[in-house]
């Protein structure tokens, strides 16, 4: 991180719950928070900058059957308890699009929009000033704006707000990716990591 700092480049690291040995980490390293380690509050108060990557409803690649548009919009991101002076160190929210199973831009558009608009409003608007009903009223203009900027295949509101049966279908189709050896291997690795983290936290 010192080398990058000398070159004028900020370094960022993905931080899961198990990363507690912060005495070895330069405070200039930005944390991408996935999980909330016990030392989060102390670190951000001491000046470490962070990006909130905690909330699964903001993962753009997850199916609308898991988190529909309203569930994403009404989710309140988890943040550490910090004072107003330290709030500047919270740089924003992450809305990742993992592309292992996103074969083309049509699929990327479908996964990302209109969900990204909901996440942007969450990041920029205080909870008391957010309204799902008001957000819905703005969607028509939002779709027009997407078209102007070349987004050709956003999810329709019906696709982004599936009924129970359609939501189940979306989830089943998404989960089919685990029905091969590589997918099963990933599940096994995930279970091992969770077990290791739980053991360290005892």
Where are these regions (language model features)?
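Acidic/polar loop patches that form or flank catalytic/metal-binding clefts of enzymes
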Residues: 3-15, 50-54, 126-132, 154-155
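Active-site neighborhood of glycoside hydrolase catalytic domains
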Residues: 1-30, 34-48
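Feature representing long, continuous alpha-helical segments
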Residues: 2, 88-91, 114, 118
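Active-site beta-loop-alpha junctions enriched in small/polar residues
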Residues: 16-19, 34-36, 55-57, 96-100
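Aromatic-lined glycan-binding groove of carbohydrate-active enzymes
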Residues: 39-97
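Histidine/acidic-residue-rich catalytic or RNA/ligand-binding cores of hydrolases
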Residues: 23-26, 61-69, 105-109
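C-terminal functional modules
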Residues: 95-110, 114-202
């Amino acid at each position: 991180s010192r080398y990058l700092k000398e070159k004028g480049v900020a370094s960022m690291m993905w931080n899961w719950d198990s990363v507690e040995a912060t005495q070895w980490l330069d405070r200039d390293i930005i944390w991408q928070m996935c999980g909330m380690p016990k030392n989060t509050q102390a670190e951000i108060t001491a000046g470490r900058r962070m990006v909130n990557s905690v909330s699964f409803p903001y993962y753009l690649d997850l199916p609308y059957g898991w988190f529909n548009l309203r569930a994403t919009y009404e989710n309140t991101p988890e943040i550490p308890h910090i004072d107003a002076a330290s709030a500047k160190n919270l740089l924003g929210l992450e809305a990742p699009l993992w592309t292992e199973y996103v074969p083309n831009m049509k699929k990327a558009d479908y996964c990302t929009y209109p969900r990204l608009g909901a996440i942007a409003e969450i990041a920029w608007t205080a909870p008391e000033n957010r309204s799902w009903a008001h957000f819905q009223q703005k969607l028509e203009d939002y779709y027009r704006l997407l078209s102007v900027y070349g987004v050709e295949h956003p999810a329709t509101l019906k696709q982004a707000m599936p009924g129970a049966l359609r939501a189940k279908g979306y989830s089943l189709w998404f989960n089919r990716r685990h029905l091969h050896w590589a997918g099963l291997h990933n599940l096994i690795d995930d279970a091992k990591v969770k077990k290791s983290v739980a053991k360290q936290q005892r």
